Structure formats: C-alpha cells, structure tokens
C-alpha cells in the first residue's frame, strides 16, 4: 500500500497503489478530445519547486499554479528569475544546501532567493524567514489536499500507506505531508530526482489491446 509523491519543478503528482494495484481511470481528455483508454490515475497540483508564491486580494499567501519553470527557474538559480518560488523558500530555510544540485556544479544563490522572498515579506509585514516558512507550509497543504482526494475521499486511510517521495523536491516536503496525514513510514529512494527517468528505462514493456462497443460505449 503506497501513496506516491512526485514533486518536480512545475507540479506535485500523487497517486495511490492499494494491495499492489495502481489506481487507474478510463476517461481522460487530450486537447479537448475524450480518451476512453485506461491510464494511471495521477492527481497533479501546482505545488512544485518552481511554483510561484504570491499574495491574493485578501492578503493571503498562495502558491502556484503558475511556475517559474526550468528557465528562468527559481531566483536562486541565477538565470534571470526574480519571483519567489518554493525552491527559494527551501533555500532560505537551509533545507537545500548550495552543493545540493548536480553535485555542486549548479550553484545556488542565497542572496537572490532572499531578495525574491523579501518582496513578499514586506507586503505581508513578516520577516523573510517566516514568509519562507509560510510558503513551504502552503505548498505542503496543497499536496496534503491532493492526497486526501485520492485516499480519504475514496475510502482509504492514508495512515495505512507508505509515502513514497521522489522527484527533485519530493523528499523536501515528505515529512510535513506524512505528519499531516498520519502516515508513519516514508520511503525516499536513492537519486530521487531521476527516479522517473530510471523507471522509464528499466520498466518492462507491455502491450494491451482494447476495443470499444459503439452500442454502449463500454471498453472491453
């Protein structure tokens, strides 16, 4: 029984595996067209490392769904980005050391991260550190809500599952998410940032043939 948590730059993607069987759906839309083919049931929300923090009209701190993407990326990447992101908040809080990316070959600029969050902190009348804490908490809350949608709302108790956290930012938020959901066990694989790529290369290939019945539109 596993709940997967994949946090990349743009989104946090969660899914559920119960009794060894991954959750699937049979109705999706692609570019406005309905697809009646089985697919993994993945719930994606805008709470990735590059998700931008902002303040709404009620002066409440929000995160996502807009993202800084890979280019220019978070402010701390020093590639032209200036808006505060979840990654910048993690840098300010010391959760992402300067040598963390590409074994130190991709430097992290702490001052740019601090400057990006300071703009929000001034509007919120809070310290930069407390604003960074708020950004991380909001992002984690969005993820918790997404996991509850695929577990609690479908009759599953998250505390009976293991949280499998991966992606570049998955391990950074795994503990807060697990604590909020009552999950007792968190599994973080080696090299979590490239787990999806490794899975793509190492997974077995299978071929499934489906036909649809035009009379009742049922897949068999």
Functional labels for PLM-detected ranges:
Residues 1-5, 13-19, 25-209:
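Helical "lid/coupling" subdomains associated with nucleotide-phosphate turnover
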Residues 10:
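Short acidic, Gly/Ser-rich segments with clustered Asp/Glu that frequently serve as metal-coordination loops
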Residues 210-219:
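Single conserved hydrophobic/aromatic residue that forms the stacking wall/gate
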């Amino acid at each position: 029984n596993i709940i997967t948590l994949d946090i990349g730059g743009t989104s946090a993607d969660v899914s559920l595996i119960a009794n060894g069987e991954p959750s699937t759906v049979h109705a999706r839309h692609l570019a406005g067209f309905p697809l009646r083919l089985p697919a993994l049931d993945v719930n994606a929300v805008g709470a990735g490392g590059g998700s931008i923090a902002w303040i709404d009209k009620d002066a409440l701190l929000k995160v996502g769904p807009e993202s800084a993407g890979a280019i220019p990326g978070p402010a701390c990447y020093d590639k032209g980005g200036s808006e505060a992101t979840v990654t910048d908040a993690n840098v300010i809080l010391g959760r992402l050391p300067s040598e963390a990316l590409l074994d130190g070959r991709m430097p992290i600029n702490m001052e740019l991260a601090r400057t990006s969050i300071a703009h929000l902190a001034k509007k919120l009348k809070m310290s930069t550190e407390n604003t960074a804490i708020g950004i991380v908490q909001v992002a984690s809350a969005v993820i918790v809500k997404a996991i509850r949608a695929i577990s609690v709302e479908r009759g599953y108790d998250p505390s009976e599952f293991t949280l499998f956290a991966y992606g570049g930012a998955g391990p950074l938020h795994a503990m807060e998410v697990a604590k909020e959901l009552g999950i007792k066990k968190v599994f973080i694989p080696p090299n979590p940032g490239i787990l999806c790529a490794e899975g793509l290369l190492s997974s077995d290939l299978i071929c499934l043939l489906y036909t649809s019945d035009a009379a009742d539109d049922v897949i068999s």
